[in-house]
A protein has these predicted regions:
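Catalytic cores of the polymerase beta-like nucleotidyltransferase superfamily
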Residues: 2-220
Length: 220
């Protein structure tokens, strides 16, 4: 069975079962966290922007991990942790002076402030967790043995150089208007085109940006 190095991916794109053969290089500490979680009966994957950037041959700024373990269970398994967002299922695990955000699979409730869900519900389903994410290129998870999990065709969109929302763009942008700026930023940084329905959602809901704080806009 062939294994594909990250640097070879831009020359060819993979779909279906070939995702399983994909090999991304992840930090040893991130892999150690995955292993510890799995040895204790939990699922765990690196997820989101780090997977996207690795496939594109870019160096990720950080490595986020998603898991079926609850925040309390994560804290029991690791000696050094920081409660960075327990209400949203996130614990930062410290390894050799590096921090890795470990977040429980979750389903988001209604967004009442255009930024955060009113409540989150933990789930045992990776699919449900990936479904809540903003864009298809950010909704992929990776495991060193099981390979790439790409339920929303993020690889195909990267191949076509497209920014596309996961699910209904109107819902995604209504949940958090800052995603509008994020779509534009990704389009500019990566040279990708914003997909038609996603672009329409931006056009309709752009006025909601007036409710986003200047600090968040500047950070984005």
């Amino acid at each position: 069975m062939s294994v594909y190095a990250v640097e070879n991916l831009p020359r060819r794109w993979f779909t279906g079962e070939e995702h399983t053969n994909m090999k991304l290089t992840i930090p040893s500490n991130a892999e150690k966290i995955l292993l510890i979680l799995e040895e204790n009966g939990y699922e765990a994957y690196v997820v989101g922007g780090c997977v996207r950037d690795s496939i594109l041959g870019r160096t990720p700024d950080d490595w986020d991990i998603t898991t079926s373990a609850s925040p309390e269970q994560v804290k029991e398994l690791f000696h050094r942790t920081v409660d960075t967002g327990l209400q949203h299922g996130t614990v930062t695990v410290l390894m050799d002076k590096e921090g890795y955000e470990v977040t429980t699979y979750r389903v988001d409730g209604d967004y009442e402030d255009g930024r955060h869900p009113k409540q989150v519900m933990f789930t045992s389903s990776l699919e449900e967790d990936l479904k809540r994410r903003d864009f298809t290129i950010n909704a992929m998870a990776y495991h060193p043995v099981r390979g790439l999990v790409d339920l929303f065709h993020g690889m195909e969109d990267m191949q076509a150089k497209i920014i596309r929302c996961v699910g209904d763009p109107m819902e995604r942008f209504h949940e958090d208007a800052l995603r509008i700026l994020r779509a534009v930023r990704f389009s500019a940084q990566l040279g990708f085109t914003i997909e038609k329905e996603t672009k329409n959602g931006i056009r309709v809901l752009a006025p909601n940006l007036k409710c986003v704080s200047a600090e968040r806009i500047q950070t984005e």
